[in-house]
Amino acid sequence: MEKLQKTVDEWKAMLDPEQYNVCRLKGTERPFSGKYNATKTDGVYHCICCNAPLFDSTTKFDSGCGWPSFYAPIADSAMVEIRDVSHGMIRTEVTCAKCDAHLGHVFPDGPPPTGLRYCINSVCLDLVPR
């Protein structure tokens, strides 16, 4: 997959301030504030920065954490996992494989069949209904 690269000014021109803060500066939206937290619409969630498909709605579940949660990405190649030791914690950050947008984190406390919980910021996503 060819990487999508843009300048800071190009990202700022195409993203709103919250999207830029979360996707490009590794911020986090407030829990329970995102538009996709409780959404049950059937479709595919794409990266807001580059439109790459990231998650299928069939893998979305209510984890109660305040952010959209999925038990698997649409493909293993859709994202990159990075060790994150910020804020005094050890976590695994997930970023878009195509454009390096920060999406959220993955935790080992999800449901079967994977046992994983991809905790993703809504502002990083664009849901395309089926």
From Swiss-Prot:
Cofactor requirement: Zn(2+)
Stored InterPro entries: Met_Sox_Rdtase_MsrB, Met_Sox_Rdtase_MsrB_dom, Mss4-like_sf
Transmembrane segments: none
Enzyme class, spelled out: oxidoreductase
GO annotation, biological process: protein repair; response to oxidative stress
SUPFAM superfamilies hit by this protein: Mss4-like (SSF51316)
Domain MsrB: 8-130
GO cellular component: cytoplasm
Protein EC: 1.8.4.12
UniProtKB keywords: Metal-binding, Oxidoreductase, Zinc
Any one Gene Ontology molecular-function term assigned to this protein's record: zinc ion binding
Binding site for Zn(2+): C47, C50, C96, C99
Entry superkingdom: Bacteria
Protein's recorded name: Peptide methionine sulfoxide reductase MsrB
Source organism per UniProt: Pseudomonas fluorescens (strain SBW25)
